[in-house]
Amino acid sequence: MIFAKTPLRIPFGGGLTDLKKYSERFGGVTVSVTIDKYIYVGLKTNIDGYINLKYMDVHEKVSKIDDVRHDLIRECLRLMKLDQIPVDIYIMADLNSESGLGGSGALTVSLLHAMHRYKGEEPTQQQLLEEASYIEVDVLDSASGYHDPSICALGGLKLIEYNDGGIRGREIEIPDIQKEVFQSRLLFFYSGKHFKSKPSLDLLNTQMDSALETMHQIKQVAYDIERALLEGNLREVGRLIQEQQLLKQQLPGHFYDDYVGGLIERINKLGGYAQLPGGKIGAFVLVYCHEDQQNKIRSQLADLQEVKINFSSCGSRSSAL
């Protein structure tokens, strides 16, 4: 049995500039971090001659790859030339799907990593992110960008640039104690609201020209966050995390409603900054606040479920049993 696990991510700034329609013209950039919540893939040969897939509450059993309903699994099998081999594939996740935390990118990377190991290959992180990006952006044309497969494959606290020269990430090197303080000032809440990102991203892509000014500002937010982190100005990082949210709300797409506006207002009144991660109204709420403000914010957000998270420095990993 081959196992692979790939971390989910929290975006801070620059998200949506990684979309192909923007990045191929102007270059995109994101700042984000991977967390200790994962997508897991198990893969093994079977003897019944079928492709067996188990994910969420779904069980697919098919004799040929074209009958696989799950787009990402089907295209990963096809790319890895495993379409003629009977295999069992199991998928598990620490958090719900469609949460705005890069789940599809993490899943694609995990699938590819497991399949490479199954074939006796040791892929590099760069290879994984390039193959996963190819499947999500080019093969499936899902309106998604390059960010999620890239940060989930690489891991860590990264600034990643996307342009004609390819995808290149660099670690934002800050002292461990500063990273610990930054992490301690982030609260994470689950709202239970799930939306698909594709409708919003499709609309943004079709109206990209009218959104360019805002997209350029979002791109600058990523560089400003990196600079603030390197300078140790964590409060400015928090402000910029919310600036990403406020700019995103100006774009065409389903990025804002009265619930989002009311939630951010509640958090701001208590001295915090907020962002709902993802290319949509995400299922999670990221809050930056000083330690002294956290209990007040927790009590005021008692209608939401707090989820404990830690930063993870590792990207995708695999093992064989």
Predicted ranges, named:
Residues G105-K119, I281-Y288:
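Short, small-residue alpha-helix embedded
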